[in-house]
Amino acid sequence: MSDAPELTVLIPFHNEAGNVIPVLEEVHDALGEITFEVICVNDASHDATEAELVEATARWPDTVRVFNHVERRGKSAALITGLRAARGEWVQLLDGDGQNDPHDTARLWPSFTGANADPRLGLIAGRRNSRNDGGFKWLQSRLANGIRRFALKDDVTDSGCGFKIMRTEAFRELPYFASMHRFFPALIKRAGWKVREELVNDRPRLAGKSKYGFLGRLGAGMVDLFGMMWLVRRGRPGIAREWDDPRA
C-alpha cells in the first residue's frame, strides 16, 4: 500500500460477526477497476468481529487496514478514526451489515471522477431504491427524513442510508460531534460543497440484528437536530478561499 489509492472504503463494525468477510469479499469483487484501500474500524465489538477482521488482513494484506477502538465510541467516532487514516481522494462509507451495495460505487465512479466531473461536488448521498424495512420502520424513517429536510434544507430525501461517497478534503473540513454521521449532507453544504443524491440498491442485513431501537433513535435524533439547526443557521464560520479553490 505504498501508492495512494483513488478511493478509501471506510466501514465501521460493531458486533458484526458473520458479516465481515462477505462484505469485504463483495467490496473486492465490485471495485476491481478502481485502486482502493479498505479501512475497517472495530468499535469495541465483543463477538467474533475482531477475529474475522484479523482473518481479513491475512486474506487481503495489500488493501485491508484495521483499527480497533479500546472502548465503544459510536459510529461517528469510528468514521473519524478511519478518516484520519484515509489516503484516497474520495471516501466511500458503507455499513458493516451488508445492506449497502459497493457495485453502486463502481457504477457511479465515472460520473464524479471523469473529465466532466464537477469540482465543487463534495458528497454523493445514496437514496434506497427499495427499502427492506417493515411498515412501521419505513413510516418513522419517512417522517424523520421529512422533518430533517424541512429544518436543514440539506437536499437529500434519505439521510438514513449508510451509502455515501465524500470528497476526502470536504470530509476533513467537518466539525466533529457525536452523531455527526446523521447530518453529513447538511454539514457538507455548510462548508460550501455541493451535494448530489443517487438511487442505490438496498438489501436485508446479512447476519445479526440492528443496533438501533426506535425510542433511542428518536430521542437522540431530535436533540441532535436542534443542535444541527443552530450550527447551520448561526454557527457558520467565515470561509476564505484560495484562488484555485473550486468553491471560490
Across the structure, where does each feature detected by a protein language model lie?
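Conserved nucleotide-sugar donor-binding
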Residues: R87-E89, G146, F150, G160-L174
